[in-house]
């Protein structure tokens, strides 16, 4: 893999949460390429949440380099990283983080309110934010009868679709999903993953999906078992686990 062409680049990373003496994550190198569908899995405590926080610029490493779209996130202030993330990363959270006092459409277009880059994308393509939100919700099979409703009136599966539409609007180049299928049964989970991967591919985004459930890996083009590359947890690898690739 050509490190210079990677969309996301991590080198010689060490990270510990404040108040902890020992790192929870130590990586030699990790790259994510443009358009890649990457599945990262592992048990609780192996560093998945820490890795996502680094990839999205929520936190900075204690040592090493994180580059996203050629930008060294380690050189940015917290506020600058927040702005960068709003412009370039669509995040699907485990709990969705939808605002209960906004309608479905307003929750989706909220991502554009915080992102000049997403607004500029829509402007260049002569798209209105609400029209693009409606297109995405239609693609994600959310009935039009729900678009003006509060998200509190939606089922878990419907809320997921709203969260995905919010992540995708304005075509950010990176989509990160943090265990968004944990509350779903198997059939609903597979349908959701098919929708997510299809929409990410249609928009040309790289998709990074994190889970503890290795059964989901068939939906992705590249698989990483995090304890195999995290030097902090590598000594606890179950030899029967799928080899990272």
Question: Across the structure, where does each feature detected by a protein language model lie?
Answer:
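Hydrophobic anchor residue at the start of the ABC signature
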Residues: 164
């Amino acid at each position: 893999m050509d490190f210079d062409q990677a969309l996301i680049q991590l080198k010689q990373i060490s990270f510990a949460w404040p108040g902890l003496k020992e790192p929870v994550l130590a990586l030699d190198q990790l790259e994510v390429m443009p358009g890649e569908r990457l599945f990262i899995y592992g048990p609780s405590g192996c560093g998945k949440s820490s890795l996502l926080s680094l990839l999205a610029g929520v936190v900075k490493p204690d040592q090493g380099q994180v580059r996203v779209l050629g930008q060294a996130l380690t050189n940015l202030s917290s506020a600058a990283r927040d702005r960068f993330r709003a412009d370039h990363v669509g995040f699907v959270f485990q709990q969705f983080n939808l605002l209960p006092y906004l309608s479905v459409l307003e929750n989706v277009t909220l991502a554009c309110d915080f992102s000049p880059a997403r607004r500029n994308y829509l402007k260049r393509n002569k798209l209105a934010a609400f029209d693009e939100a409606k297109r995405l919700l239609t693609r994600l099979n959310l009935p039009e009868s729900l678009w003006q409703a509060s998200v509190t009136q939606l089922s878990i599966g419907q809320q997921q679709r709203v969260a995905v539409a919010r992540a995708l609007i304005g075509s950010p180049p990176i989509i990160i999903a943090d265990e968004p299928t944990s509350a779903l049964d198997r059939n609903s989970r597979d349908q959701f993953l098919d929708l997510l991967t299809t929409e990410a591919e249609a928009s040309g985004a790289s998709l990074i999906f994190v889970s503890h459930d290795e059964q989901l890996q068939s939906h992705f083009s590249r698989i990483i078992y995090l304890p195999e590359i995290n030097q902090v947890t590598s000594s606890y690898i179950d030899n029967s686990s799928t080899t990272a690739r």
